[in-house]
């Protein structure tokens, strides 16, 4: 396809191995250090790109306190080969933070406000718990359902509204682990994981080039034995069908098509369309439906045109209604999350948007796909979607 000089293209993508937040590989690595090592690793394998050309480091992070505070984008950038003359900003759109970071870079490129951006995100949920320092306004319950801030209960609500059974959720959770393990065994994550030093369960320092969150031993029988995690009486959502609490970071190099051409780079993909949407916070997990419909309309496409989809697996009870209403349930095995998802890999909030986008691009490359959608729900009722075309 012919590109406009101001089209925004993805030049490369990398991520850390995903670590368990409780005693995991990253337990002795700080969030900004992890981010810096990832950024340096991605730039090191792209020697044609001069770090001094980076206009801005745009980094998603949700709980911006402790080691994730004081503008972690800048804090991480100062630890890398990127010179002090490049800028840095931290973005929070909760679960959609690093996809918003991507959108911000794309919008800047399209409006001639920069040519080279480093985007991504991090969340070290082992060091900074999701509720640390958070003080929700008690008056929120006058404007939205009281349970809107309790993600597990919103998933229960959405699953109940759409008739999603416990068995269907368990099957979805099992699928995530099996596909992620299969992708690992077949080397499908090799291009996207930047190996990192970390500590194993015995405390020994080693290099990790795989995700320690995947549980290949998962069985449907084992999942069926788990108790409801959020609604003890009649609930269907369990720990086994929820995204894992994980430590990790993801990163992309985003450029104008003209600058990529000037440097002789072959981009992975071009961003065709982007969209956001809001929904009732009580069913926050439904957000990807309107945001994806909006993004496809902006791209002049329908879901039938899309070869592959990455939907963040916040909860099986949330993902299945989204897939149902996007008319993807009967095409799930050929199109959706072919390398598993957040149930197996985890959902480090600030990291996930860029992570699913980059995984999508690799899935498309490995399966000769042309058009793809990355989409995710966002706490308190939002959806975010990006349409990519592989180059």
Swiss-Prot record:
Keywords: Acyltransferase, Cytoplasm, Fatty acid metabolism, Lipid degradation, Lipid metabolism, Transferase
Active site positions: 95 (acyl-thioester intermediate), 347 (proton acceptor), 377 (proton acceptor)
Pathway: Lipid metabolism; fatty acid beta-oxidation
Disulphide-bonded residues: none
Broad class of the protein's primary localization: cytoplasm
Broadest EC class assigned to this enzyme: transferase
Keyword DNA-binding assigned: no
Job of this protein: Catalyzes the final step of fatty acid oxidation in which acetyl-CoA is released and the CoA ester of a fatty acid two carbons shorter is formed.
Protein name: 3-ketoacyl-CoA thiolase
Source organism: Stutzerimonas stutzeri (strain A1501)
């Amino acid at each position: 396809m012919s590109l406009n000089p101001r089209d925004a293209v993805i030049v490369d993508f990398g991520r850390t191995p995903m670590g368990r937040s409780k005693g995991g590989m990253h337990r002795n690595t700080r969030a900004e250090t992890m981010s810096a090592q990832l950024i340096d690793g991605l730039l090191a394998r792209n020697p044609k790109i001069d770090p001094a050309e980076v206009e801005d480091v745009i980094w998603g992070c949700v709980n911006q306190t402790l080691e994730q505070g004081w503008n972690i984008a800048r804090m991480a950038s100062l630890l890398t080969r990127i010179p002090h003359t490049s800028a840095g900003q931290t973005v929070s759109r909760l679960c959609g933070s690093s996809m918003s970071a991507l959108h911000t870079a794309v919008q800047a490129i399209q409006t001639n406000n920069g040519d080279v951006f480093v985007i991504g995100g991090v969340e070290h949920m082992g060091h900074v718990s999701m509720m640390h320092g958070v003080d929700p306004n008690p008056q929120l319950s006058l404007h939205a359902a009281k349970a809107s801030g309790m993600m597990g209960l919103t998933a229960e609500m959405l699953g109940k509204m759409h008739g999603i059974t416990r068995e269907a959720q368990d099957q979805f959770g099992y699928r995530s682990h099996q596909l992620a393990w299969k992708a690992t065994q077949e080397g499908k994550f090799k291009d996207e994981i930047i190996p990192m030093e970390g500590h194993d369960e015995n405390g020994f320092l080693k290099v990790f080039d795989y995700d320690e969150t995947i549980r290949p031993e998962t069985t449907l029988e084992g999942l069926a034995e788990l108790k409801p995690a959020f609604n003890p009486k009649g609930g269907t959502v369990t720990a086994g069908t929820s995204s894992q609490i994980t430590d990790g970071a993801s990163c992309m190099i985003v450029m104008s098509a003209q600058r990529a051409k000037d440097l002789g780079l072959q981009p992975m993909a071009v961003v065709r369309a982007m969209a956001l949407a809001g929904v009732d916070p009580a069913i926050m997990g439904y957000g990807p439906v309107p945001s994806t419909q909006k993004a496809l309309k902006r791209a002049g496409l329908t879901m039938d045109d899309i070869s592959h989809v990455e939907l963040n697996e916040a909860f099986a009870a949330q993902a299945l209604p989204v897939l149902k209403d996007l008319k993807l349930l009967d095409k799930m095995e050929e199109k959706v999350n072919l390398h598993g998802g957040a149930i197996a890999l985890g959902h480090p909030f600030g990291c996930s948007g860029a992570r699913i986008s980059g995984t999508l691009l690799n899935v498309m490359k490995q399966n000769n796909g042309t058009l793809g959608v990355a989409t995710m729900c966002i706490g308190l009722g939002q959806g975010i979607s990006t349409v990519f075309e592989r180059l």
